[in-house]
Curated annotation (Swiss-Prot):
Sugar-modified residues: N11
Name of the gene encoding the protein in the UniProt record: 5HTB2
Protein's recorded name: 5-hydroxytryptamine receptor 2
Protein family per UniProt: Belongs to the G-protein coupled receptor 1 family.
Pfam families the UniProt entry points to: 7tm_1
Membrane topology of this protein: Multi-pass membrane protein
Alphabetical list of SMART domains matching this protein: 7TM_GPCR_Srsx
Cell compartment(s), UniProt: Cell membrane
GO molecular function, one term: G protein-coupled receptor activity
Tissue: Central nervous system.
Keywords, comma-separated and alphabetical: Cell membrane, Disulfide bond, G-protein coupled receptor, Glycoprotein, Membrane, Receptor, Transducer, Transmembrane, Transmembrane helix
Gene Ontology BP, a term: adenylate cyclase-activating adrenergic receptor signaling pathway
């Protein structure tokens, strides 16, 4: 986690059997365990469930799950040990890796969430063009790009040696430690040191800490690029998705007098999107507000508040598989099968695409469906054509022609799988 203060988190006199330490251990262990199990289940569900494995959206869900899984295994575990012991146990080299992996996994997780929102919007906005637009190659290129960007903002600063301190800077740090006036160095955008924290009596064995001080300018740039811009795009995508869902729902309801159970689909979509955006903001916004403040003066924010914001960000990796998994009926079925250790019963559908769309509309009142849909092709004389091609018509009391694209969009939205399909 990018943070401007870790050197005075705990000292060598920490009581390892205090209620506070026990609480930290229990809560941290639960977050790590749920993160690992949940994200492993997501990956297994996608690769073992035929319906999920054939979807282009799987790449983005797997990217999110892998980022959260790596964050739990490589970052949270060692962060918890560091918090419990009060000092760094794993050496200077791994400290570099740990800090960089922290930034990379968090950035990749946020970017993946943003890409998922864009992908889902495209699915509903242009369902007929989606398969042609979102090819496997394009999906993999998007995933590769977001991971490369995440790597750049995390590891490159170390490779450029922005973190190295001169001997004069090291002497200044130790002088400040002795005088209890530790200040953040402004000489570099980054400053890293594996320092020796003195105990209360100043004579005890020094305890190393893994530190990562952040300059204010970098903190602002990182927060803007890796959180505020992706967050704005995600909110924009989900707002447009909600408006499309509302528009299509009202149109189909007015034309076909939907079954009463379909009357709740709009509220289900709104509830799902509210949970997604609300959870994301609740977990990440506090840290990205406090982090620039910490870079200016590490004493402005109480230590306890700062640590809470760090673990709130970690907690997002715990709830992601719950939200993005259980909001989809296919994932729920796959989770139940995996938890019960049941085998997959794969079936091959022989139903044509148009017939599948028609069958998906079985919730329309039967009396309005006098027969199967017919295709009206562009012969240059059809007054209902829009840009050529064919449209699928469903006989209704009002004889309204509904395009196949609109039908497919409503099929997606009617299943309440607003996030992933």
């Amino acid at each position: 986690m990018l943070c401007g203060r870790l050197r005075h988190t705990m000292n060598s006199t920490t009581c390892f059997f205090s209620h506070r330490t026990v609480l930290i251990g229990i809560v941290g262990s639960l977050i790590i365990a749920v993160s690992v199990v949940g994200n492993v289940l997501v990956c297994l569900a996608i690769f073992t469930e035929p319906i999920l494995s054939h979807s282009k959206s799987k790449f983005f869900i797997v990217s999110l799950a892998v980022a959260d899984l790596l964050l739990a295994l490589l970052v949270m575990t060692f962060a918890l040990v560091n918090s419990l012991y009060g000092y760094w146990l794993f050496g200077e080299t791994f400290c570099f890796i740990w800090m960089s992996a922290d930034v990379m996994c968090e950035t990749a997780s946020i970017f993946s969430i943003c890409v998922i929102s864009y992908n889902r919007l495209k699915q509903v906005q242009k369902p007929l063009q989606y398969e042609e637009f979102m090819t496997t190659t394009r999906a993999l290129l998007i995933i590769a790009s977001l991971w490369i960007c995440s790597f750049v903002v995390s590891f490159v600063p170390f490779f450029l040696e922005w973190h190295e301190l001169s001997m004069e800077e090291i002497k200044t740090i130790f002088k400040d430690l002795i005088s209890d006036k530790v200040k953040t160095s402004d000489a570099h955008t980054f400053s890293f040191a594996l320092e020796q924290t003195l105990g209360d009596n100043r004579t005890s064995n020094p305890k190393p800490e893994c530190l990562f001080d952040v300059h204010f300018i970098y903190s602002v740039i990182y927060s803007l690029f890796c959180f505020y811009i992706p967050c704005t795009l995600m909110l924009r995508n989900y707002l447009r998705l909600f408006l499309i869902a509302k528009k299509h729902h009202v149109r189909i309801k007015n034309l076909h007098r939907l079954h009463r159970n379909q009357g709740t689909q709009g509220s289900k979509a709104a509830r799902t999107l509210t949970i997604i955006t609300g959870t994301f903001l609740a977990c990440w916004l506090p840290f990205f507000i406090i982090n620039p403040i910490e870079a200016v003066d590490e004493h402005l924010i109480p230590l306890e508040c700062f640590m809470v914001t760090i673990w709130l960000g970690y907690f997002n990796s715990c709830v992601n598989p719950i939200i993005y998994g259980t909001s989809n009926s296919k994932f729920r079925a796959a989770f139940q099968r995996l938890l019960r250790c049941r085998s997959v019963k794969s079936t091959v559908s022989s139903i044509s695409p148009v017939a599948s769309v028609y069958r998906a509309f079985s919730w329309i009142r039967p009396s309005l469906l006098d027969g199967p849909p017919s295709a009206v092709c562009d012969t240059g004389q059809d007054e209902n054509r829009k840009g050529g091609g064919c449209v699928t018509t469903i006989p209704t009391e009002s004889h309204v022609i509904i395009s196949e694209e609109e039908i497919r969009a409503n099929v997606m939205l009617s299943e309440s799988d607003t996030v992933f399909s």
